């Protein structure tokens, strides 16, 4: 669990691991943290993470409502979009959407011009210009996977943010499709 996902600081997180499970060391050295990650603990960040985890700052129910509002909005204005993943397995703050007939890189630039942050994939694949291996594993074609964007919602996201994103998406997708044809 990354602290920043619940309103805590960047660079700190938690790993829950059964004692019987062995994983290779991330950092070698003094043997702290069951020899998985050696080094001095960042006590202030740990305390801030704990405070964030206990606070009402990150409310999964509210964030799920924003996500669901976004899904309802984009499927209303763009009925051809595909919402990826099973509804029952969705995380509160993440939606991955396929926009048929577009290229995700083009959509990303057009959304950025509207001051809307989204991504062509997970944070760990940022800067990689390949189809999402997750979408490919889910059975999507290469073309479909390269027509997808990931939208994330967090504690600072608002209904106004959702409404604005939904309002600009039809024009962004139209322009993205036109660029894809040229």
Specify the residue positions occupied by each region the protein language model found:
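Pyridoxal 5′-phosphate
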Residues: 1-182
């Amino acid at each position: 669990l990354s602290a920043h996902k619940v309103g805590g600081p960047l660079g700190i997180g938690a790993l829950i691991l059964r004692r019987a499970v062995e994983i290779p060391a991330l950092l070698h050295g003094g043997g702290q943290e069951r020899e998985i990650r050696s080094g001095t603990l960042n006590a202030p960040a740990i305390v801030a993470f704990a405070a964030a985890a206990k606070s009402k700052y990150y409310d999964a129910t509210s964030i799920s409502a924003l996500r669901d509002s976004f899904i309802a909005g984009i499927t209303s204005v763009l009925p051809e979009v595909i919402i990826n993943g099973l509804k029952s397995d969705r995380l509160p703050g993440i939606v991955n959407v396929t926009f048929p007939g577009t290229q995700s890189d083009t959509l990303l630039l057009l959304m950025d011009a509207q001051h809307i942050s989204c991504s062509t994939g997970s944070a760990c694949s940022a800067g990689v210009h390949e189809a999402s291996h997750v979408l490919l594993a889910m059975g999507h074609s290469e073309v479909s996977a390269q027509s997808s964007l990931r939208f994330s919602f967090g504690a600072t996201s608002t209904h106004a943010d959702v409404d604005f994103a939904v309002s600009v998406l039809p024009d962004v997708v139209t322009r993205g499709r036109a660029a894809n044809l040229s």
